[in-house]
Amino acid sequence: TLSGALYHQSTFNNLFIEGLSVTAGLRLDYEKISMKYNSLSTPIDFGFDFHMAMGPTQINLSDQNMKAPASFVGKLSTDYVQLLPKFAIQYEWKNQNNVYATVTRGYRSGGYNIQMFSDLSQTELKNSMMNAIKESPTIGQDATWGATIIKMMDQMVPAKEIDVKTSTTYKPEYSWNYEVGSHLTLWEGRLWADVAAFYMDTRDQQLSQFAESGLGRITINAGKSRSYGAEAALRASVTKELSLNASYGYTYATFTDYVITEEKKDSTPIITDYNGKYVPFVPKHTLNIGGEYAITCSPRSIFDRVVFQANYNAAGRIYWTEQNDVSQSFYGTLNWRTNLEIGDAMISFWARNFLNKDYAAFYFETMNKGFMQKGRPMQFGVDLRCRF
């Protein structure tokens, strides 16, 4: 991979009125990706037997000394050039108190699914074996039935054309991102609040899924999607010892143009429409609540400082598939930590998922089966740290 970028950003402060700033930026991105593939192998030895009754005639053909080459050699190269603008406006009426709006264009580079070569090699081997059978003298010398048998083979096991570039390449993902929000400092600088609302239009969205063979994960492009939502966060220094924080996010992400058309063996089209379905792996709600209480010990104490920390992290609902038929409902885990500080050393006692919540951390489907990874159960531990 070869990549490079040119970037410029200008900010105009106190434009028209005190505290108003406008920012404009532009990034020129260039990326060249290339791939060489070489899967040379010794020709496969195989044989075939063909037995069929055609009216009163019994056809018996056999050849057990056949060879089929199975090799894949070539290279691919793709260039991407992108212009990514950025615009922002902010009004700050007091230090650390402002409102803002931004518009940016997002980009995620494309690439190659090298895991697809397992599927492509199998297809190439199948085509090679079928061609070897058709060219076999055993069939070719049968002037009466040879052409009929080859026609039947083409109908029953049609050759599949291989396009390496189309099969392995996934396109870049593009998005337009819009956000408005505010950063506030209140309560004599002891309370910080951040609020934001966002909207995102995404084209050629990249999704991860398993290859048809089940050997390795690949990236696909899933048409268009739309996401919008809001986020809010609070941090408070209640006292010198006690601090609290909380954050919440809501995201509504759905496909707006994602239709897949596949063909059965009889060429009947199968149309799957994902429009309106939720984008997988995007939590609809996220929540975090935490706090810290720090005690400074007296000089006669063994410890210099004792810190108690606790937080509750939650997320859901999370859909695992484009069909939205498997999901994890809203769940949360409680975690805590106690730090005992002695000079440059620290002993920490901690617990994760203290309430032993049962939840799914990941899910995927391959070979028409679903596999779920459960979240870690309740854990306890001790950490020892020393700074030198």
Positions of PLM-derived features:
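Signature of Gram-negative outer-membrane beta-barrel scaffolds
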Residues: T1-Q96, Y112, A132-K134, P158, ...
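Gram-negative outer-membrane beta-barrel transporters
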Residues: F16, R190-R203, I218-T321, R385-R387
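Membrane-embedded beta-barrel scaffold of Gram-negative outer-membrane proteins
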Residues: N98-T102, S121-N221, R226-Y228, G249
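Outer-membrane beta-barrel strand-turn architecture
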Residues: F12-E18, L83, Y91-N95, Y174, ...
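C-terminal beta-signal and adjacent terminal beta-strands/loops
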Residues: Y107, E241, Y312-T321, W336-F388
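Flexible, surface-exposed loop regions and adjacent strand-edge segments
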Residues: N38-F48, A53-G55, M116-E124, Q209-I218, ...
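Transmembrane beta-barrel architecture of outer-membrane proteins
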Residues: T1-L6, L26-K36, D79-P85, V103-Y107, ...
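Residues on the lipid-exposed face of transmembrane beta-strands in outer-membrane beta-barrel proteins
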Residues: L6-F12, F87-Y91, Y170, V180-L184, ...
